[in-house]
Amino acid sequence: MRATVLSLFWMVTLVIIVRAQIPESHDEQTILSLPLFPADIVRNHIPLTQALGAVGASVEGGFALFGLELHSTDGQEPIVSVDLPPESRFEDGLRQVMGQIPGYEYEVTSEHMINIYPRGAKKNPADLLNTPVPKFDAVDVDPGGVLTRPADFIPELALRLRPKTSAGPQPSGYGGSVLRSNVTITLHLKDTTVRQILNAASEAMEQLPQEYQPVGWTYLFQPDPESLIGGKHSWAFLFSAPRNWKQHSAKPGPNA
């Protein structure tokens, strides 16, 4: 009887250990294991967004988009380096970059989307990207506009960016570059947040033709205690998809 109990104990313990080594989701397991271009990838002392773009553009057999939230007292990006040997995987590049920006964490949110933000930011109700949006409907809109001028499309965000002494909305920061294209996307979301809307706009670009590479987004917050809206809020694109991204965006059918 004792031997049976001990056997069961070790079986249960083994199952727990094995489960702890399994990635949290299929999406995380898939995207992190993607191989990179089989050559040295070296970039020295470059802005964080460029480093993420370099790692993403080297992905083979898939693609990755980033949603990056940065908090910076001087309005500048962290400077990092990338030094990856051949046979590296996407996870190696991501972890190398993350190791140079202490205080930040990443989350795989979907098949192709990775969010990076200050530790604890996602649970902070004061964070602008966590602004609740009960209903979001955008029909035939330029995805670049949503990513770089989100306050123009999200009334709840525009309200947060309105100084308390102002009679009308006055978004702070800049809108970034404009994606000049003739393509549009349509989004219908309920009980969402600004962060999730930005993610959805990037993910919707997966349906675009080959010549339109999907892009991620960057939100830069520069705190200013004297500002009526807490500081400067800026949005821009984050390029990271390889040129052959479309070859890997279509999911195989049931008979594949």
Annotated model-derived regions:
Residues 2-5, 9-256:
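N-terminal targeting/assembly segments of extracytoplasmic apparatus and virion spike/baseplate proteins
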